[in-house]
Amino acid sequence: TKAHVGGMAYDTMNQILWVTGQGSTWAQANAITLSHLENYSFDDGYHPIEFDMSYNLYKIKRASFMTYHDGALFVGFFTQDNASVIEKYLINADGTLYEKEDMNLKRTVGVTDPVAYAVSMQVISGKVQGMAFYNNKILLTRSWGILPSEVQIFNYSRYGILSTSEAYK
């Protein structure tokens, strides 16, 4: 699978840890509540912790990295050369992800987990491995192999392509 533990985000409003994942055909966002984490003990049966919620992510190819900002999960995927995307998934007041009411995707594609619907998408350059928000800015980290790593900084309000040529740095 292409998902990795680098894809983690913490929802401070609902106290939920989100982790990227990959289902049989869909990228996923999986959730564990803080209370579940605090009450979990590996010594009680030697079993991995189970997710409290799992969502198939509609529209995104893979979930390589994610971050939480202002009531939403931003999920992106890593590509070596091609442009990639970041999708924005809204978090409801109860901590669940937004599902478009008229979507009948679960039955159509044969999945049992809920299908979260992205409300917006940003095109980004390849080699992005992480994302953060700071003072109305989007920070993207880019790295691959022995090449120098970099942090690209964009205005948060900017829509469209977040390409290397548009970055402050």
For each predicted feature, which ranges?
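Structural motif
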Residues: 25-38, 81-98, 146-163
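Conserved beta-strand positions in repeat-built beta-propeller and related beta-rich domains
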Residues: 17-23, 75-79, 140-145
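Long, hydrophobic, well-ordered secondary-structure blocks that form the structural core
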Residues: 2-49
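Beta-strand initiation motifs
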Residues: 1, 36-53, 93-116, 158-169
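Surface loop/turn motifs at the tips and blade-to-blade linkers of beta-strand repeat domains
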Residues: 2, 54-59, 119-124
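Hydrophobic, aromatic-enriched interface-forming segments
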Residues: 60-112
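Loop/turn-rich, solvent-exposed surfaces of beta-rich toroidal or solenoidal domains
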Residues: 115-169
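Structural signature of eukaryotic scaffold interfaces centered on beta-propeller domains
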Residues: 6-15, 58-75, 79, 124-134
